[in-house]
């Protein structure tokens, strides 16, 4: 992980590395082992589903719920109140330019949720083992690889929208 610590006046660039040390090589006393946080395995149901699971909303949680279901072999149906991202961008831009507000398609409703119009900063919970899975998934769908090592991961809205469409 990369981070910058400027809390105590001076700026300190910090890097945490995972390394393997050969036998016989003494580790320095200030080296600390890194605990790898593995995402828990998802338990699969045992009963066959008669219908596809339904996910309500295509915001971050809805997209990831649908993606996880699809990876497990289900065919989820995602219901979203707003429009697909390309149409949503046009509708929101029209509103920003002084046009009419669309109660069905706006900054809050549509593919990507409210985050599709944010600055692209990711609030990741460092202690949550699923956090790494989320970042890896975003990187697999076109987010910059740097988010995997940044302490404060940042995609940027211009890059976030194609990632959402890819998912």
Give the location of each predicted region.
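Residues forming the flavin
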Residues: 1-117, 121-141, 145-167
């Amino acid at each position: 992980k990369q981070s910058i610590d400027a809390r105590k006046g001076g700026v300190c660039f910090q890097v945490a590395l995972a390394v393997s040390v050969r036998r016989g090589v003494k580790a320095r006393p200030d080296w600390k082992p890194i605990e790898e946080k593995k995402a828990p395995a998802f338990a699969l149901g045992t009963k066959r589903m008669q219908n596809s699971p339904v996910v309500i909303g295509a915001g971050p949680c809805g997209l990831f719920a649908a993606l996880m279901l699809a990876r497990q072999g289900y065919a989820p149906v995602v219901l979203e109140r707003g429009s697909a991202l390309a149409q949503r961008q046009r509708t929101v831009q029209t509103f920003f330019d002084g046009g009419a507000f669309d109660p069905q398609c706006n900054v809050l409703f549509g593919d990507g949720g409210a985050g599709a119009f944010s600055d692209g900063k990711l609030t990741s919970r460092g202690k949550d083992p699923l956090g790494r899975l989320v970042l890896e998934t975003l990187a697999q769908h076109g987010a910059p690889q740097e988010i995997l090592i940044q302490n404060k991961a940042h995609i940027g809205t211009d890059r976030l929208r194609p990632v959402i469409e890819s998912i």
